[in-house]
Each structure stands twice: as structure tokens, then as C-alpha cells.
UniProtKB/Swiss-Prot annotation:
Keyword flag Glycoprotein: no
Gene, per the UniProt record: GSTA1
Domain remarks in the Swiss-Prot or TrEMBL record: The C-terminal domain may form a component of the hydrophobic substrate-binding site, but in contrast appears not to be directly involved in GSH binding and is not absolutely essential for catalytic activity.
pH dependence comment: Optimum pH is 8.0 for the isomerization of androst-5-ene-3,17-dione.
Compartments, as annotated in UniProt: Cytoplasm
Residues with the N6-succinyllysine modification: 4
GO cellular component, one term: extracellular exosome
Annotated binding of glutathione, by residue: 9, 45, 54-55, 67-68
Purpose of the protein: Glutathione S-transferase that catalyzes the nucleophilic attack of the sulfur atom of glutathione on the electrophilic groups of a wide range of exogenous and endogenous compounds. Involved in the formation of glutathione conjugates of both prostaglandin A2 (PGA2) and prostaglandin J2 (PGJ2). It also catalyzes the isomerization of D5-androstene-3,17-dione (AD) into D4-androstene-3,17-dione and may therefore play an important role in hormone biosynthesis.
Annotated protein name in UniProt: Glutathione S-transferase A1
Family per record: Belongs to the GST superfamily. Alpha family.
N-acetylalanine: residues carrying this PTM: 2
Xref: InterPro entries: Glutathione-S-Trfase_C-like (IPR010987), Glutathione-S-Trfase_C_sf (IPR036282), Glutathione_S-Trfase (IPR040079), Glutathione_S-Trfase_N (IPR004045), GST_alpha (IPR003080), GST_C (IPR004046), GST_superfamily (IPR050213), Thioredoxin-like_sf (IPR036249)
Length: 222
């Protein structure tokens, strides 16, 4: 029996949460090896486990994969969540790059200087309402199907629904004008594998708080 994937990161969302979501949605059990100190990170580096000296790192199928996009691409390909042909894959890539752009803004919000946080949050909300959510609502409306690409579950649906949960944490009213996105969120959330991941006690991580931010500062020395 194949070994479970091993996820090396600290105990927070950060740049590993999308991998947790994708594996969970695919029904794949995984182990987490939490980095708890700067010394833990140094050991991974010194042992030659981190090609570019940084995490996330996932041990899977005899490889030690780094770089978030490479990790997600491999998992999506392995578990048939990356479209049926090159055209579908191109659409999926286009959608997830947009998702990643908005996700990066939300990811970096906790480390934003306090005096800039209100302006940054206002900018994020503006882009959600006027750029990103209308674009994805239009995709769903244009083909009238249940999923973003090919009327079949893909990584694009999973990454988008993960993002919808983050947006809901910022301001639950932001999705109210986008009924097809709301329906997609409900549909994906009710898939048995995703439903399990959304339950308390799963590997899903809570929003970044001051404690986990301080832990990150110590581990990554920033």
C-alpha cells in the first residue's frame, strides 16, 4: 500500500492550506509533519529536503516536492482534477491564477502594517465585488453547468470554494449578490470528502491569529 503523502509546514493555513483542501477533496488521507521552530526548518534545509530552502514541502510518490504550484499541479493530475484535455487545462489554469491573485492578497493581510490594514481590506473587498466574483459568476452563467470547467469537478472548483470561505470570513455579505457562486459553494461543500474536511477535528486550519502569526515569525525569522 502506498504511503500517505507527508505535508511539511507549520500548523497554520499559509501556503499549505490549498494542498490540504485538494487532497481532502480527492479523498486522500495525509500526514502532517509540523515545523515548530526555526531549528526544525534548518534541519530540513541541512538534510537537503528543500530544493529552494523553503516550505511548503510534500513527500509523495518518492518525491520531495516544493513550490506550491508544482505540488498542486501534481496532485490535481494524479487524482484526475485537472480537466480531460489541454483546452480544459488551460481554462483551469486561467481560473486558478485569478483565484491565486485574490488569495494572495487575503493571505498577506495578517502581516500588513496596522496603519495600512483598513485601506488594504477596502481594496480587497472592492476587487472581490467588481473584478473577481463577477468574472466567476459570469463563467457559471455562460454555460449553465454545475462546475467551472467541463461539467466535472476540477481543482478550479475546489480552489474557488476554498477562497469563498476565506472571503466569507472577511465579510459574509460579499457573496450575497452572486447566486451561482453561492450555489457552487453549497454544492462542493456537500461532496462527502469536502463535507468531512469541513467538520471540526479535520486537518483544516483556522484563520491566522496573533499566536500563529508570532509562531510564523519565529520559525521563518521575519
Amino acid at each position: 500500500m502506498a504511503e500517505k503523502p507527508k505535508l511539511h509546514y507549520f500548523n497554520a493555513r499559509g501556503r499549505m492550506e490549498s494542498t490540504r483542501w485538494l487532497l481532502a477533496a480527492a479523498g486522500v488521507e495525509f500526514e502532517e509533519k509540523f515545523i515548530k521552530s526555526a531549528e526544525d526548518l534548518d534541519k530540513l534545509r541541512n538534510d537537503g529536503y528543500l530544493m529552494f530552502q523553503q516550505v511548503p514541502m510534500v513527500e509523495i510518490d518518492g518525491m520531495k516536492l516544493v513550490q506550491t504550484r508544482a505540488i498542486l499541479n501534481y496532485i490535481a493530475s494524479k487524482y484526475n482534477l485537472y480537466g480531460k484535455d489541454i483546452k480544459e487545462r488551460a481554462l483551469i489554469d486561467m481560473y486558478i491564477e485569478g483565484i491565486a491573485d485574490l488569495g494572495e492578497m487575503i493571505l498577506l493581510l495578517p502581516v500588513c502594517p496596522p496603519e495600512e490594514k483598513d485601506a488594504k481590506l477596502a481594496l480587497i473587498k472592492e476587487k472581490i465585488k467588481n473584478r473577481y466574483f463577477p468574472a466567476f459568476e459570469k463563467v457559471l452563467k455562460s454555460h449553465g453547468q454545475d462546475y467551472l470547467v467541463g461539467n466535472k469537478l476540477s481543482r478550479a472548483d475546489i480552489h474557488l470554494v476554498e477562497l469563498l470561505y476565506y472571503v466569507e470570513e472577511l465579510d459574509s455579505s460579499l457573496i450575497s449578490s452572486f447566486p451561482l457562486l453561492k450555489a457552487l459553494k453549497t454544492r462542493i461543500s456537500n461532496l462527502p470528502t469536502v463535507k468531512k474536511f469541513l467538520q471540526p477535528g479535520s486537518p483544516r486550519k483556522p484563520p491566522m491569529d496573533e499566536k500563529s502569526l508570532e509562531e510564523a515569525r519565529k520559525i521563518f525569522r521575519f
